[in-house]
């Protein structure tokens, strides 16, 4: 058996190695861990937790009963890890601040992600002056959307109400067309949870399709 006596007396590590060891030791001192590293991890965990909570509620409202439980599973695991870290350090205010700021920022980030996902269908009600809604009806039919037109009476005379069920990610394009071709039209948009049937059957959407299209969409140059 060979015995390694180690470095000879008077041996010194290279300066670069000494510096790396010093930085590593500094990063893992108790004060750095308790007041910076662990609070940052709790902050990030809380952002992820609240984002998942927001998306889970959205998926439940859209009737996605298989995807919502999967998100709930990971959501509760992350929440338990974060809350255990806070409860084990009740005397450290950094943990409370990290948890609170993570909750606030996670709410905002979750709403932004939900908006980018553009999940599900919406119902559009468009009210135009009598005879001026034919262009909107033709446009919706060209986009493979069914329309229901009703003659009604408004405060200033006859109007036409156009009702159509459209994909949520198509709403910006449709509203832009309405504002350009019929700026005087009034329209409202409501979420729809379930669709049974119609003239044009809606296609099943991948919940991440809208988000991917948003990322891939070319941005305008200033």
Curated annotation (Swiss-Prot):
The keyword DNA-binding does not apply. The chain crosses the membrane at residues 25-45, 67-87, 93-113. It is found in: Cell membrane. Its main location: membrane. It is a multi-pass membrane protein. Keywords: Cell membrane, Membrane, Transmembrane, Transmembrane helix. The keyword Membrane applies. Pfam families: DUF2179 (PF10035), DUF5698 (PF18955). GO terms for cellular component: plasma membrane. Belongs to the UPF0316 family. This is UPF0316 protein Mboo_0791. The lineage of its organism: Archaea, Methanobacteriati, Methanobacteriota, Stenosarchaea group, Methanomicrobia.
